[in-house]
Design a protein with these regions (language model features):
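N-terminal leader/targeting and accessory segments in enzymes
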Residues: 1-91
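Walker A (P-loop) phosphate-binding motif
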Residues: 91-97
Length: 97
């Protein structure tokens, strides 16, 4: 599914990234593969954003992360910032699957 279609209505995706073909959604960086959308879920013990670079190195094409995450992070892929990562994760998964 195209990134723009997957996020439509919830996340503003820059036009140059809207045509990225997402083949998998992952919140575990160790499971990311080529074509993944990595969702950096903040947690109590650790923060998913700490693992975004690993997900990208494994082939993730974009990252969904909390507001402010893009500042100071140049992962080489779009970082789509959202207010509530867990809420968006459910919506994205529902639309994708």
């Amino acid at each position: 599914m195209l990134l723009g279609e997957l996020c439509n209505g919830w996340i503003s995706v820059p036009a140059e990234y809207g045509e990225l073909e997402i083949v998998q959604i992952e919140c575990d960086s160790r499971e990311a593969t080529a074509g993944s959308l990595f969702i950096a879920v903040p947690g109590e013990a650790t923060d998913g954003l700490l693992y975004a670079a690993e997900a990208v190195s494994r082939g993730a094409l974009a990252v969904i992360a909390p507001q402010g995450a893009a500042e100071g992070n140049d992962l080489g892929v779009p970082i789509l910032e959202v207010e509530d990562v867990r809420d968006i994760m459910g919506k994205i998964a529902d639309r994708f699957y």
